[in-house]
Amino acid sequence: MACSTFSKPLKDKINPWGPLIILGILIRAGVSVQHDSPHKVFNVTWRVTNLMTGQTANATSLLGTMTDAFPKLYFDLCDLVGDYWDDPEPDIGDGCRTPGGRRRTRLYDFYVCPGHTVPIGCGGPGEGYCGKWGCETTGQAYWKPSSSWDLISLKRGNTPKDQGPCYDSSVSSDIKGATPGGRCNPLVLEFTDAGKKASWDGPKVWGLRLYRSTGTDPVTRFSLTRRVLNIGPRVPIGPNPVIIDQLPPSRPVQIMLPRPPQPPPPGAASIVPETAPPSQQPGTGDRLLNLVDGAYQALNLTSPDKTQECWLCLVAEPPYYEGVAVLGTYSNHTSAPTNCSVASQHKLTLSEVTGQGLCIGTVPKTHQALCNTTLKTNKGSYYLVAPAGTTWACNTGLTPCLSATVLNRTTDYCVLVELWPRVTYHPPSYVYSQFEKSYRHKREPVSLTLALLLGGLTMGGIAAGVGTGTTALVATQQFQQLHAAVQDDLKEVEKSITNLEKSLTSLSEVVLQNRRGLDLLFLKEGGLCAALKEECCFYADHTGLVRDSMAKLRERLTQRQKLFESSQGWFEGLFNRSPWFTTLISTIMGPLIILLLILLFGPCILNRLVQFVKDRISVVQALVLTQQYHQLKPLEYEPQ
């Protein structure tokens, strides 16, 4: 009898899988800051996917924290095998397509090898990451494969091997012991201690093989993915009701560059411009790169382990920003601050707000899921200013401060939110999967947004710093850079809307001018409407409302900038005004401190060293002198 290619006594079964060199984004690490409560509850979904067929073997959802939402997952071995094996063997059959194939599959042991961390020589996807013995970390076999570092353990369920004929109850309902779908190979997946501590930012892959005494062990692969969602719904807050009808941005039209000006003919007088050209404003590409760079700086400060190797991608379709409702302590002012105006109410709508935070005013039932605490304003004339790094998302628009008088007289409501750009985070496994050879099914990438990774960081950091004196750790240059990038992008949005309003006004003037010309041409017939025998249409100019909203928007952006600058100390402002100052100080601070210590303690240490050497030399000299001379014995005189 021929020996099995994948039998237990053999060691190296195949040549090692050649390494695949992939260029990732290697990023330096920063300082870690705890940014989320460990008691926060999420909607966690675990999904087991057969990578050979793309079918879902198990999808389990539960409510829990990030430290205890690790349930047992139950599914069938045939959900991972499918109807056919890649390399069918005569005694295995085609797979789980027939009752006989399902029954024969149940007779064999199986072992599992990890694909998320592949040891040297364990092969690739084609071998199920089991290129040699010792790569298996779990399974159901006579040698009891196990591991102390793998993330899961996969064993057979409670059904004994000799129970059930593996018939499908929907086809053969009269046969005793038939099960739905003919499932007779139950498996139980449990998380190990290492798996409960691991980062599940992306899908993890394993290979499973049936152990046979002869022939080749058949292979299948499966992935395990965790999806985390906030319990609260994603609802819009703002005055714009047409949010769900947004379309992705159209492709940009190619702009023809103007030809360079021809040099003037000889003898012609050259014209010198009187004014200098205006300073170049940052373009769209620069602003988008600033957003991504600011997102990286903030993420690197809070979670340096996630930025060792990753992809940060800016979402190219609306919504471009999302809000995270937070709890915070606002400031109460009896008079209007200089950076806050009660009358200005611009019309920026935040289309996605998640989480639960502080609400003020009359909150409708559709938005009460966003409220952890709802406050009613007392009567009086005072102003509520949002903390640094946050803003009020109201049904009238985004604003840095509120008027209690306006809230008491109206049914308006506001939610305290943090504003985050829509930047998605992709782990290294997503990049590697793009270069792997696809056999049948391409894995769906799992992405996390910046709001999910950093949501609540501003208020959480401030709350933690009140008792520990570490509030300054949150107000760092990284978060200020992200805040400045968001403000610059909002200013460009305001400019774009203003330019659109001007274009619409110009177009309406052209249309009205054409209308007057046509009325003159058809004057004998009584005008254009009489000639067409239609009702006359008149132009209603609403661009004034847009112009007023844009003026208020510019005013509010200026106020937010003043509020941001007023919250900074003189020391932080010094670093912001001189960006090179940070690099200079960090470069020369170490050598300066070492030089200062040498100047302070160097003379004392040198004197001690010289005195010690002198003492040792004196002792040595004394020893040398004593060795050259010896004491004479006293002479005894005889009496005469």
Curated annotation (Swiss-Prot):
Disulfide bond entries: C113-C130, C122-C135, C310-C313, C310-C537, C529-C536
Lipid group attachment sites (S-palmitoyl cysteine): C604
Transmembrane segments: 585-605
Region feature Immunosuppression, mapped onto this chain: 512-528
Residues in the Extracellular compartment per record: 33-584
Sequence motif CXXC, residues: 310-313
Chain segments carrying region Receptor-binding domain (RBD): 32-236
Motif (CX6CC): 529-537
Cytoplasmic side, ranges: 606-640
Pfam families referenced in this protein's UniProt entry, alphabetically: TLV_coat (PF00429)
PTM: Specific enzymatic cleavages in vivo yield mature proteins. Envelope glycoproteins are synthesized as an inactive precursor that is N-glycosylated and processed likely by host cell furin or by a furin-like protease in the Golgi to yield the mature SU and TM proteins. The cleavage site between SU and TM requires the minimal sequence [KR]-X-[KR]-R. The R-peptide is released from the C-terminus of the cytoplasmic tail of the TM protein upon particle formation as a result of proteolytic cleavage by the viral protease. Cleavage of this peptide is required for TM to become fusogenic.
Residues spanning the signal sequence: 1-32
Site (Cleavage): R443, E444, L623, V624
Glycan-linked positions: N43, N58, N300, N332, N339, N372, N408
Database matches in InterPro entries: FMuLV_rcpt-bd (IPR008981), TLV/ENV_coat_polyprotein (IPR018154)
Residue ranges annotated as motif YXXL motif: 629-632
Coiled-coil residue spans: 477-511
Note on domains (UniProt): The 17 amino acids long immunosuppressive region is present in many retroviral envelope proteins. Synthetic peptides derived from this relatively conserved sequence inhibit immune function in vitro and in vivo.
UniProt subunit comment: The mature envelope protein (Env) consists of a trimer of SU-TM heterodimers attached by a labile interchain disulfide bond.
Protein name according to UniProt: Envelope glycoprotein
